[in-house]
Amino acid sequence: MRRTLTQVYDAIFRPSRFVGANVNRMQGRAVQDVAAVSRLLVVFAGNLVIYAVPLTLAGFGTAPAAAAPRSLAAVSTPLGLSPTWTWDFLRRFVQNSLYITLAAALTFAAFHGSVQFTRSSTGVVPSLHTVVYSTSAYLAGVFSVVWLLSTSASIAVADALVLNAQKRFVYTIIDATGASLVLPSGRPTPVSLADATPADQAALATLAVILGYFVYSLYLGSRINHGASRLTATLTVLTVGLTPVVFVLGSIALSLGSLPIP
């Protein structure tokens, strides 16, 4: 419990200590590397459960109605749980976990690829350490706030503003490629801030602060765990920032069968 509280304190007030790793201790033989990777994956899995379970219990996530497997009743019934509820919970839990896991994987690929390309890498484990702690804390926080925006009527203006920004980002790429695609929700429309409440402003400020923490943690991870220069660390952060662009381009290519070149 004390260690958990210390990590929370470090994540807020000492991010350099939170994402920093003992590089000398991490650089060892293959067996030590495997052990370090295993520990980091356990940390990520634990944080993933802490992130996804409350969201799932709160009703986040969509899962089409489906009959629970008969074998599930043998496990859930003795625990006093309905097989149908348990099956619905498990499917929504997987969905809620999938987004942050995919984001972490893309972040790791971009982060480690960048430090490798700039020849500042001290190994895979320091990169994994950086990404595990930055995504399971800060990026998970960003996702949580976005989920909250989508379900709370009291911060509807903030939700509309975030959705509008997301659609503008996607349509900028769609228009740049000349793709003939239309999002189900249509093109972005202007959002009036006249009706924004203090709750809307607080939600947007919280989102901005957590996102800033995430970006800064990647910068610190590159500087501390890989000994990168300020310029190299900045380039690494910019590389990670390009992953949403790559994701949208990939989605366009999958939708059309190829990527149009304007």
Residue positions per predicted region:
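Interfacial loop-to-transmembrane junctions
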Residues: 218-243
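Membrane-interface interhelical connector segments
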Residues: 65-84, 152-196
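N-terminal juxtamembrane cytosolic/stromal segments of multi-pass membrane proteins
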Residues: 1-61, 65, 73-88
